[in-house]
Amino acid sequence: MAAAVSSVVRRVEELGDLAQAHIQQLSEAAGEDDHFLIRASAALEKLKLLCGEEKECSNPSNLLELYTQAILDMTYFEENKLVDEDFPEDSSSQKVKELISFLSEPEILVKENNMHPKHCNLLGDELLECLSWRRGALLYMYCHSLTKRREWLLRKSSLLKKYLLDGISYLLQMLNYRCPIQLNEGVSFQDLDTAKLLSAGIFSDIHLLAMMYSGEMCYWGSKYCADQQPENHEVDTSVSGAGCTTYKEPLDFREVGEKILKKYVSVCEGPLKEQEWNTTNAKQILNFFHHRCN
């Protein structure tokens, strides 16, 4: 166990050094101080100090959390730049790939070192959800930009399909980390609507956005990639909001999109009715799926 801990500490330290160098490059290119880069750099400096202590005494969970928070801030700065520039066609593909790689590193690190059979114990559900959300949301924004480029779609719809499948996979993964709260006499809630949301696996506004984003990506896949040969891209297609369902199957854009958007509309017009979440786009997509099926 001590050897495994020491290995993780060394690897986190190496990754932290690489990230710090990357932040330095970003800061120099930006020509001004940025809140997110400053915060990311501070987290990595703290990480460096902790890694300098006795490695056997280091808490890998704390180190990994610091590294993950730094990566989330660093990549957020770069994502904002991509969005502001509307994902430049000549460089965005490589940049998106690079950001996905950064955001995947914490999970990869834990899995490679087999620190715990349930690696979420090291990162925690909220950080795992955030990593999946950020990857899925990044691909959603990128695909949204690509769907407006008619010539690009004619040439590279197969590439769009790959981005969509990956993005949907990350968003469904995010929705499936936590199990819904089972309603019973031993659990008390302040109001019935909150109870309904938690029992549906809706723990935050981000969970709702993830449902809408994945449903919209399924729509793009069905609209722009329908003529392509199906791929054996297996995804956990359950949308219960829980990690309890672990079966995987090839993703069917229409089927998954219908399932998740029906739940989205039900939640928005049910327990969240007073908050006036917009369901117009979701209903239009469901209507598209209905006519496409018939």
Curated annotation (Swiss-Prot):
Domain of life, per lineage: Eukaryota
Keywords: Acetylation, Autophagy, Cytoplasm
Subcellular location per the Swiss-Prot or TrEMBL entry: Cytoplasm, Cytosol
A GO-annotated cellular component: nucleoplasm
Major place of residence: cytoplasm
Keyword match tRNA processing: no
Positions where N-acetylalanine occurs in the chain: A2
GO annotation terms (biological process): mitophagy
UniProt xrefs under Pfam families: RIMC1
Subunit-level organization: Interacts with the MON1A-CCZ1B complex. Interacts with GDP-bound RAB7A and promotes its interaction with the MON1A-CCZ1B complex.
Function summary: Plays an important role in the removal of damaged mitochondria via mitophagy by controlling the stability and localization of RAB7A. Required for the recruitment of RAB7A and ATG9A vesicles to damaged mitochondria and promotes the stability of RAB7A by inhibiting its proteasomal degradation during mitophagy.
Family: Belongs to the RIMOC1 family.
Protein name: RAB7A-interacting MON1-CCZ1 complex subunit 1
Record organism: Homo sapiens
Gene from which this protein is expressed: RIMOC1
